């Protein structure tokens, strides 16, 4: 299956049911599946020489288009994800950490392509952001996904929408 990891496959269970198989899936996905943000997990186990293997329900449907990102279902999933204390607490138990706003700006400055990082206008925006950031309040921090591109979302033939990429 197309993607950056090279560890995602379409498989088939012994009863012929198609499944999405992923090796080395982040542990948070099981919590996201319970919250109905990602597709249901059918099984998870360790395989010798292959690592952690997860099978998720195979979804027949389509990848969302850019114009779909404002849909009611996408908004509802994001609200559920961003305001779930269960999800945040589970993530913290799995050693995920809080990222403060200044951390995000510093990360961008460090990881942006040189052409963007050297752009004086963007440098001034980063500096302005750093100079005017509000104080970080951990009690209102939320769990977020760093790449909400429309290609990371699927709408099933039955109309359900899931966020699918957690790399």
Where are these predicted regions, by residue range?
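Conserved kinase catalytic-core helix
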Residues: 62-97, 119, 123
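Protein kinase glycine-rich loop
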Residues: 1-2
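Active-site acidic catalytic loop and adjacent metal/ATP-binding pocket
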Residues: 6-13, 130-167
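Active-site catalytic-loop/activation-segment of kinase and kinase-like phosphoryl-transfer enzymes
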Residues: 93-134
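A conserved alpha-helical element in kinase catalytic cores
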Residues: 15-55, 62-81
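Surface-exposed, active-site-proximal loop segments in enzymatic domains
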Residues: 56-59, 108
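A conserved long alpha-helix in the C-terminal portion of kinase-like catalytic domains
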Residues: 27, 118, 158-161
């Amino acid at each position: 299956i197309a993607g950056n990891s090279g560890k995602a496959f379409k498989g088939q269970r012994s009863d012929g049911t198609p499944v999405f198989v992923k090796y080395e899936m982040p542990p948070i996905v099981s919590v996201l599946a319970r919250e109905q943000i990602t597709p249901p997990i059918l099984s998870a186990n360790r395989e010798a020489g292959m690592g952690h293997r997860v099978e998720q329900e195979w979804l027949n449907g389509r990848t969302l288009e850019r114009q779909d990102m404002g849909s009611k279902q996408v908004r509802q999933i994001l609200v559920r994800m961003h305001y779930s204390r269960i999800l945040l607490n589970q993530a913290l138990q799995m050693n995920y950490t809080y990222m403060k706003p200044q951390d995000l700006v510093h990360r961008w400055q460090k990881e942006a392509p040189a052409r963007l990082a050297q752009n004086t206008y963007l440098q001034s925006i980063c500096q302005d952001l750093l100079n005017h950031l509000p104080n970080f309040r951990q009690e209102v921090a939320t769990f977020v996904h760093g790449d909400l591109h429309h290609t990371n979302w699927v709408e099933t033939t039955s109309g359900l929408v899931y966020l699918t990429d957690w790399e």
